[in-house]
Curated annotation (Swiss-Prot):
Domain Radical SAM core: 8-228
Binding site for GTP: R17, R71, T102, K164, R267, L268, R269
Gene3D superfamilies from the UniProt entry: Aldolase class I (3.20.20.70)
Residue ranges, annotated region (Disordered): 325-362
Family the entry assigns: Belongs to the radical SAM superfamily. MoaA family.
Pfam families recorded: Fer4_12 (PF13353), Mob_synth_C (PF06463), Radical_SAM (PF04055)
Enzyme Commission no: 4.1.99.22
Superkingdom, taxonomy of origin: Bacteria
Full protein name: GTP 3',8-cyclase
Listed GO MF terms: 4 iron, 4 sulfur cluster binding; cyclic pyranopterin monophosphate synthase activity; GTP 3',8'-cyclase activity; GTP binding; metal ion binding; S-adenosyl-L-methionine binding
UniProt keyword annotations, A-Z: 4Fe-4S, GTP-binding, Iron, Iron-sulfur, Lyase, Metal-binding, Molybdenum cofactor biosynthesis, Nucleotide-binding, S-adenosyl-L-methionine
Organism, scientific name: Acidothermus cellulolyticus (strain ATCC 43068 / DSM 8971 / 11B)
Binding site for S-adenosyl-L-methionine: Y30, G75, S126, M198
Function (record text): Catalyzes the cyclization of GTP to (8S)-3',8-cyclo-7,8-dihydroguanosine 5'-triphosphate.
Amino acid sequence: MTQPIRDSLGRPLRDLRISVTDRCNMRCRYCMPREIFGPNFTFLPRSELLTFEEITRIAAAFIRAGVRKIRLTGGEPLLRADLPRLVAMLADLPDVHDLALTTNGSLLARYARPLRDAGLRRVTVSLDTLNPATFSRLADTDIPLDNVLAGIDAAQSAGFFPIKLNAVIRRGVNDGDVEELAAFARDNGHIMRFIEYMDVGNSNGWRAADVVPAAEIIARISSHWPIDPLPPRYPGEVANRFRYRDGRGEFGVIASITQPFCRDCTRLRLSAVGEVFTCLFAVRGHDLRSIVRSNTDSAAIDAALDEAITRIWSRRSDRYSELRALDSDGSREDADESEASAVPGRSTHPGHRKVEMSYIGG
């Protein structure tokens, strides 16, 4: 088995997240606020998007570098035409241990069965609330919440089990929904994951005061149902997991603000136009599309991809969330400023604008 390459901090490359489109049919405030991503916003033209064949070729190169888990994201990935065909192509690659999809669920009722038949193994659905009015306000959409719930049911009927449900919790917005979401997941055999509101991109108006700490979420759930912590299932797992003592499943929290996990991050993100980003909070990407579209022979293209991926990952040193946490508690007074300046996404430095989450997926 290929040993994964490691970055400058010793982190192995194991996970690849592939954005297949920058478009979405919702306008969630924490990702694509309508005042920025409105009718006049220019999305990527189709000619600039990687083809399915190009995506598969790049994915194969990442597998040669040690990647074993692939997740398709967006925007909303189900807006990409004929997505089950891409799933089938990726599922046919050797040594892919996990092939998953993250979706807002609005189109999942239509695509759950074709995706499963094509070889998709897992589905994660964004579900920030079970209140229809709160949902409409959060997602800034006319799409009914029932469409998302129907998509979750269809995925379960198609054989996806367990289904993970992601909820980004914001103070004063949906923090009152935590217990209801947990109960819904318990009652239906799903795994609920509560995510601390993150300062991703530049357009979501993030404030630290809006963050509901994972510790508070855990305390609230444990006051209703006794729980016990679970060990990580694999190195680099981002969620802290807990099981319900009554045997009715588990839930997780992703505490990227209060408990950064940069030191264990094994993920790399590929945008829909073939740019590679080594951090969710990155400022700039690395172009792979020009390699796969170069006018040269197949072996030379594969060799160039292998070299580029090794170079990009081996030079990686970003740990944005850790440095943010150090800044916030004053622990970085003696930190090397050159390190901070070199870290992608350091928004505390003038001119550094982080890539938007809708461009590279969450």
